[in-house]
Amino acid sequence: MALNIENIIAEIKEATILELNDLVKAIEEEFGVTAAAPVAVAAAGGAAEEAKDSFDVELTSAGDKKVGVIKVVREITGLGLKEAKELVDGAPAMVKEGVATAEAEEIKAKLEEAGASVTLK
């Protein structure tokens, strides 16, 4: 029995919607397939929440040990004493912008150890 593609197509053209629906269901059952179009799965969290590779380190509060926080800010930023004090006194303020994840975590840990409150953005 040879398949004649043109005859099959002609038969499909003349079939009703209900007959074509039954045909699709029969093919799905017979071959264990589905006629549903493949759907692209969105990345977890969507594109807006992709894993960030750089962060801004923001000093939200200097806490009780302002002198220690100023020393750490000077060490991290290379600012002079006056500039570092102004940054700490002006909290919330950006300490560093666009730093790598590991460096941002390290800076956050140093500042928190000195008594500051820090957020990564």
UniProtKB/Swiss-Prot annotation:
It comes from the Bacteria. InterPro entries: Ribosomal_bL12, Ribosomal_bL12_C, Ribosomal_bL12_C/ClpS-like, Ribosomal_bL12_oligo, Ribosomal_bL12_oligo_N_sf. CDD domains: Ribosomal_L7_L12. The keyword Ribonucleoprotein applies. Keywords: Ribonucleoprotein, Ribosomal protein. Gene3D superfamilies: 3.30.1390.10, Single helix bin (1.20.5.710). Coiled coil: none annotated. GO terms for biological process: translation. One of its GO terms (cellular component) is cytosolic large ribosomal subunit. The keyword Transmembrane helix does not apply. One of its GO terms (molecular function) is mRNA binding. Forms part of the ribosomal stalk which helps the ribosome interact with GTP-bound translation factors. Is thus essential for accurate translation. PANTHER family: 39S RIBOSOMAL PROTEIN L12, LARGE RIBOSOMAL SUBUNIT PROTEIN BL12M. Homodimer. Part of the ribosomal stalk of the 50S ribosomal subunit. Forms a multimeric L10(L12)X complex, where L10 forms an elongated spine to which 2 to 4 L12 dimers bind in a sequential fashion. Binds GTP-bound translation factors. Belongs to the bacterial ribosomal protein bL12 family. This is Large ribosomal subunit protein bL12. The gene is rplL.
